[in-house]
Design a protein with these regions (language model features):
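Short beta-strand-to-coil "C-cap" segments at the C-terminal boundary of structured domains/repeats
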Residues: 143-149
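Extreme N-terminal tail/first-helix region
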Residues: 1-35
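Short beta-strand micro-motifs in enzyme catalytic cores
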Residues: 40, 139-141
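Short, structured beta-strand-loop surface elements
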Residues: 3-5, 72-127, 133-137, 145
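Short coil/turn segments at secondary-structure boundaries
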Residues: 35-38, 131-135
Length: 150
């Protein structure tokens, strides 16, 4: 049984819930009003609620099948809720187009963080602006595909 079998609880912020619905209906073919043309849906499990939460994010990937998710929240003073969820349960599901897969999650620092941060800024240049506008250290998580078990 996967923790992602839990019930889905849409975001209480209507624009996010609508973006998730748009992505799932079109497999990401329609651009996002929030995160642009190249986007993904991150699934986490609520640390307190135990329900599935879904968040539209900028697509940041490498050639090895790994992804990064950046907890910028537009440079807000606090981390997005999904950061707390990933720290509590370092497991994610990610929808990229029509494909949905599970990933192991690692919060990265040092060289790994720098490499992902550079890649992220190539896709979405506002990340440096977000970091400059907040006193918090914006977290970066690497998502590595989970091994498929028979």
């Amino acid at each position: 049984v996967s923790p992602f079998d839990a019930p889905y609880e849409p975001s209480p912020w209507e624009p996010i819930a609508e973006e998730v619905e748009l992505y799932e209906r079109t497999a990401g073919a329609e651009p996002s009003a929030v995160v642009g043309d190249d986007w993904i849906i991150l699934w986490t499990v609520g640390a307190r609620s135990g329900t599935v939460r879904k968040t539209p994010l900028v697509r940041i990937a490498d050639d090895a099948g790994c992804y990064a998710v950046i907890g910028s929240m537009g440079g807000a003073p606090n981390n997005p809720q999904w950061v707390h969820n990933l720290r509590a349960l370092p497991l994610a599901r990610l929808q990229d187009g029509a494909e949905v897969r599970e990933f192991d999650v690692l919060e990265v620092e040092g060289d790994a963080r720098s490499e992902w941060w550079t890649r992220a800024n190539q896709v979405w240049p506002e990340y440096d602006t977000y970091q400059a506008s907040t006193e918090r250290h914006i977290p970066v998580f690497e998502l590595a595909p989970r091994a498929v078990t028979p």
